[in-house]
Amino acid sequence: MANQLILLKKDFFTDEQQAVTVADRYPQDVFAEHTHEFCELVMVWRGNGLHVLNERPYRITRGDLFYIRAEDKHSYTSVNDLVLQNIIYCPERLKLNVNWQAMIPGFQGAQWHPHWRLGSMGMNQARQVINQLEHESNGRDPLANEMAELLFGQLVMTLKRHRYATDDLPATSRETLLDKLITALANSLECPFALDAFCQQEQCSERVLRQQFRAQTGMTINQYLRQVRICHAQYLLQHSPLMISEISMQCGFEDSNYFSVVFTRETGMTPSQWRHLSNQSD
């Protein structure tokens, strides 16, 4: 694409030897589609927004983790108090003898799965390492770059240890109710979600959980689930031959007319218009 925005190394790294640095987004504003001359890890701490990665939309909130390659196209829209950090790195500058391909999905041709989640325990450990990494990447002493790379190695190992698929929180996990709730919502794309049953199972207060969820994500539970379902519908409309009525069922809407109303309200166009526009841009 002739007018594609490309973020350049020289605008983020202090010199050609620096391999890793941290870019804070407190908050992350709307950002047009772009690629990079470097790779990045994206950690979401709070709030919510729409992250479109290689034309696939993701409704993101606390705990979302992305592995972004240099050539990937992504953008941020519909942001609401979205707080995240980008840990950016140049693969060719890394000198540490670490099996990076085993730690970082998509690293120099490794199998790529971009979207993961971290529970509260993993987030806390990652935040501690990122704070140290940010301090070193801003340092000027002779060993700052080496220390930053060591910490980057520690970070990617920490992320590998604690990350999990968005709909697959391990049964043995000691994560918080909020983490369990977000995983349960990810497993409810096709079927109704009963918050009262979830709270009964977890022996928690429904009112308190609703308050905690809104405080951390900036959305109600129903708003988040609706947004996740609409994002899934957008993906299916673009990448599957399913009929709109079939897509509505796969996204938890038993009535395709109601699905069309909600989809239009959230995206500004009907499902048919979205599919037509997406096919034109392919």
Curated annotation (Swiss-Prot):
GO molecular function, a single term: DNA-binding transcription factor activity
One term under GO cellular component: cytoplasm
DNA-binding span(s): 196-217, 244-267
Keywords: Activator, Cytoplasm, DNA-binding, Repeat, Rhamnose metabolism, Transcription, Transcription regulation
Pfam families listed in its UniProt record: AraC_binding, HTH_18
Keyword Transcription: yes
InterPro entries named in the record: AraC-bd, Homeodomain-like_sf, HTH_AraC, HTH_AraC-typ_CS, RhaR_RhaS-like_N, RmlC-like_jellyroll, RmlC_Cupin_sf, Tscrpt_act_RhaR
Keyword Cytoplasm among record annotations: yes
One of the GO biological process terms: positive regulation of DNA-templated transcription
SUPFAM superfamilies for this protein: Homeodomain-like, RmlC-like cupins
Major place of residence: cytoplasm
Residue ranges constituting the HTH araC/xylS-type domain according to the UniProt record: 179-277
Site (Interaction with sigma-70): 246
Subcellular location: Cytoplasm
Domain of life: Bacteria
NCBIfam families (alphabetical): PRK13500.1, PRK13501.1, PRK13502.1
Quaternary context: Binds DNA as a dimer.
Record function comment: Activates expression of the rhaSR operon in response to L-rhamnose.
Family matches, as PANTHER family: ARAC-FAMILY TRANSCRIPTIONAL REGULATOR, HTH-TYPE TRANSCRIPTIONAL ACTIVATOR RHAR
Protein name (Swiss-Prot/TrEMBL): HTH-type transcriptional activator RhaR
Organism this protein belongs to: Salmonella typhimurium (strain LT2 / SGSC1412 / ATCC 700720)
